[in-house]
Amino acid sequence: MTNTPQTPPKERANGVIVGACLAFVAGMVGMAYAAVPLYDMFCRVTGYNGTTQRVEQASDVILDEKIKVTFDANVGPGLAWDFKPVQRDIDVRIGETVQVMYRAKNLSSKPATGQATFNVTPMAAGAYFNKVQCFCFTETTLQPGEEMEMPVVFFVDPEIVKPVETKDIKTLTLSYTFYPREPSKPIAAVKDGETENRL
């Protein structure tokens, strides 16, 4: 019989507790990083918090009933832009595909990049507001003094007239806020003087 040293039960228990605590902390850090994209995905799928839907094609059903859509524009701190809708509101037939324009101008003396966030109020209507094309899908860079018109193509889903929460809505507000962003950098940049056809 050999005498092999054994780890006392108390030390083994402490090691398990330390390992569990480290795993818990690592899990919490991972959840913190995943929370924003998961919440964004949840809002886009459900229309929660007035988040609009992104679609590839227009509605094939157009109702005679009309709904008023008003447009709102805001600029977050740190972005010296003038940003506004070209028209304040329109009356559209439910299901009709419509294009409206927003206008942005860089008031600063250097290039500035921004990206727009958006929502629809009343919030219950967000799931029925479908965007086919929108400047909010990508970031926008404006040179000093540059002015740009930016289209939004959308329709209000005819299903909005069915649920109790949305069937009596007569006015929607589409609101955008532009926030400053660092411009995206290309994944692989070619240095000056280098050829692109390297082996």
Swiss-Prot record:
**Principal location listed in the UniProt entry:** membrane
Which keywords, in A-to-Z order, does the entry hold? Cell inner membrane, Cell membrane, Copper, Membrane, Signal-anchor, Transmembrane, Transmembrane helix
Record GO biological process: respiratory chain complex IV assembly
Q: Which residues lie on this side of the membrane: Periplasmic?
A: 36-199
- What is this protein's name? Cytochrome c oxidase assembly protein CtaG
The residues on the Cytoplasmic side of the membrane are 1-12
CC terms in the record's Gene Ontology section: plasma membrane
Q: Where are the bilayer-spanning segments?
A: 13-35
Which compartment or compartments is the protein found in?
A: Cell inner membrane
Q: Which gene encodes it?
A: ctaG
Q: Which family does it belong to?
A: Belongs to the COX11/CtaG family.
What SUPFAM superfamilies does the database record attribute to this sequence?
Ctag/Cox11
User: Mind telling me which InterPro entries this protein's record contains?
Assistant: CtaG/Cox11_dom_sf, Cyt_c_oxidase_assmbl_CtaG
Record-linked NCBIfam families: PRK05089.1
Q: Matching HAMAP family, A to Z? A: CtaG
Q: How does it sit in the membrane?
A: Single-pass type II membrane protein
Q: Give the protein's function.
A: Exerts its effect at some terminal stage of cytochrome c oxidase synthesis, probably by being involved in the insertion of the copper B into subunit I.
Q: Which GO terms describe its molecular function?
A: copper ion binding
Instruction: Tell whether Transmembrane is among the UniProt keywords.
Output: yes
